[in-house]
């Protein structure tokens, strides 16, 4: 928006509403020189700070200005761009700003004429866009500003400065971006200056030349006015290491000021301090004109924040006013770490529980095999399990039950795993009352194994004090014994089973036999036997040497009031 600072007259219009419902904000008069590029940005904070649409029109035409970039006059985002200005471009242009519920309009009155900075006989220098009055302060270090503001589609080359038609050279003059720094201003520095640059747009080049009339004054300022830095406010900014950061320095100052606005670090201009790496650069100054003051913005860009930048004050200077920012690492977000840790912990816990549920039986059996002792458990019990089984009426079921109970169970649990079982019909004492024998031996067992078949009346001792009733009553009521329920075949309906069996099924579940009474089914490492062993008391399995199955001769006991008074005689012979 370099044209905003040219010698134009801003005439404020009373806020009025036209027939189309748009409010007129103000009119801007611009006196321009032909044959030069010109751009005007339609901006009016805070109206244009939100989501709005901007459309340019010429005079009262209802046809918008073209947005085709090849057109000499076209709209570029919020700008209207002339490449270049011509004599016939004079007139009033309208910028319509439409928001969701609002409509505002800015008028720009352009006057184009031919004007030369130097005598035309010299040649070589193009026509000026206009003159702008600036002031240097005698005996001080001061600066002149070349107001060249165009949209991002325009690329400006290096700026050259002239005084009285001669290029400026010397140690007292330094070109910094769009500014000419003048050290130790003297009376000879007054005169006519010009700044020249090459503008490139869509592959075409144009020359831009601004004329500046410079006067010298001994006053320190204008009415004692001091620039006001709105932002930054001497504060810290949290920024992650390695990120890109852009910070604006916003300054309000009088329209006729000549204050230098820049960023410094360690009392050195940022561009000079990082001249080699160019990692941190100062941006081009822009400004917005208001009725009584200008709002200037000059930013600093960190292409990549490094550790050396933290804790270092980056100073924004505007005349005698200064303000700084200090970069610092963001404080650790403990809440994020805590939430992440909890999520990870829950995920691990769920995974462990899931894996344990899948491999629970193998894990428990491995632990018992690795760490449990093979010594006899001293708990007053003689047997690891009491085996309770039915007496089916069907011959096939009776044969299957006998094979499982009298052959396979002893082979796997007793011989391979070292458990000691009490099997009614194999280990009872002849001549003793059934109820007493069962009641006494159930109390000497650590587990109760109940084998069921679909034939609910298959239990031959279901009447009165039957074996099943005594064993289940003792296991569930008196001793709190753990019960292992084995289904010889799939049982569809447990409601026809005795209530005690229904209770066991509901409380402990059931293990279904999948074997076929072959040698393969007699391996303790099959899934069925692993499940049975999991429910049995802990014991380290130690395989016995391969011997023939033993024929068990019933043991004779003499019952007494004390367990220690019992005597047992056993005769074991090989079959």
Swiss-Prot record:
It catalyses: NAD(+) + H2O = ADP-D-ribose + nicotinamide + H(+). Expressed in synovial fibroblasts and articular chondrocytes. Expressed in keratinocytes and monocyte-derived dendritic cells. Expressed in monocytes and myeloid dendritic cells; at protein level. It is found in: Membrane. GO terms for molecular function: interleukin-1 receptor activity; interleukin-1, type I, activating receptor activity; NAD+ nucleosidase activity, cyclic ADP-ribose generating. Residues 20-335 are extracellular. It is an enzyme of class 3 (hydrolase). One of its GO terms (cellular component) is cell surface. Disulfide bonds join 42-95, 146-195, 249-316. One of its GO terms (biological process) is regulation of inflammatory response. Residues 1-19 form the signal peptide. Residues 20-111, 126-211, 222-318 form the Ig-like C2-type domain. Residues 381-536 form the TIR domain. The chain crosses the membrane at residues 336-356. Residues 357-575 are cytoplasmic. Glycans are attached at residues 41, 59, 109, 127, 184, 234, 250, 266, 299. It is a single-pass type I membrane protein. Its main location: membrane. Keywords: Disulfide bond, Glycoprotein, Hydrolase, Immunity, Immunoglobulin domain, Inflammatory response, Innate immunity, Membrane, NAD, Receptor, Repeat, Signal, Transmembrane, Transmembrane helix. It comes from the Eukaryota. The TIR domain mediates NAD(+) hydrolase (NADase) activity. Self-association of TIR domains is required for NADase activity. Belongs to the interleukin-1 receptor family. Receptor for interleukin-36 (IL36A, IL36B and IL36G). After binding to interleukin-36 associates with the coreceptor IL1RAP to form the interleukin-36 receptor complex which mediates interleukin-36-dependent activation of NF-kappa-B, MAPK and other pathways. The IL-36 signaling system is thought to be present in epithelial barriers and to take part in local inflammatory response; it is similar to the IL-1 system. Seems to be involved in skin inflammatory response by induction of the IL-23/IL-17/IL-22 pathway. PANTHER family: INTERLEUKIN-1 RECEPTOR FAMILY MEMBER (PTHR11890), INTERLEUKIN-1 RECEPTOR-LIKE 2 (PTHR11890:SF9). This is Interleukin-1 receptor-like 2. The lineage of its organism: Eukaryota, Metazoa, Chordata, Craniata, Vertebrata. The gene is IL1RL2.
